[in-house]
Curated annotation (Swiss-Prot):
Mg(2+) 1 binds at D10, E48, D70. CDD domains: RNase_HI_prokaryote_like. Monomer. Mg(2+) 2 binds at D10, D134. NCBIfam families: PRK00203.1. HAMAP family: RNase_H. It is an enzyme of class 3 (hydrolase). This is Ribonuclease H. GO terms for biological process: DNA replication, removal of RNA primer. Coiled coil: none annotated.
Length: 155
């Protein structure tokens, strides 16, 4: 029987771009696990995406996932926009390269392993797990240890 897992994610950036971090809460039955990491220079959207990728990668087998994010960018990107991006060879409707294509491709790969119900929650609205993720992400952003090698400054 496929495991039912709940995932909550958030990304944070101190400046955009700037130091950033992600926070994740994974829940299986009554057990919760948290993940967080900070990056020296990145963007908020990249951290929101990184949170979902890392969370899905942490699952050792295919699962039924309820994934809750406060990022419409992530939720709409993976459920709506990505289909046309892939058809166009990772280009937008106006023929420009898709921003954060490295992470969209990684997220797309992870989503094929699982059955995912993508949910959105308003950030900073008292949602327990979202607040936990926000605190984890902020703390990670305040103490960044990694380089976001895929980050490309806007021109």
């Amino acid at each position: 029987m496929t495991k039912q897992v709940e995932i909550f994610t958030d990304g944070s950036c101190l400046g955009n771009p700037g130091p950033g971090g992600y926070g994740v809460v994974l829940r299986y039955k009554q057990v919760e696990k948290t993940l967080a990491q900070g990056y020296r220079l990145t963007t908020n959207n990249r951290m929101e995406m990184m949170a979902t990728i890392v969370a899905l990668q942490a699952l050792k087998e295919p699962c039924n996932v309820i994934l809750t994010t406060d990022s419409q960018y992530v939720r709409q990107g993976i459920t709506q926009w990505i289909h046309n991006w892939k058809k166009r060879g990772w280009k937008t409707a106006d023929k420009k390269p898709v921003k954060n294509a490295d992470l969209w491709q990684a997220l797309d790969k992870e989503t094929t392993r699982h059955t995912i119900d993508w949910r959105w929650v308003k950030g900073h609205a008292g949602h327990r797990e979202n607040e936990m993720c926000d605190e984890l992400a902020r703390a990670a952003a305040e103490n960044p240890t990694l380089d976001d090698t895929g980050y490309q400054p806007a021109e």
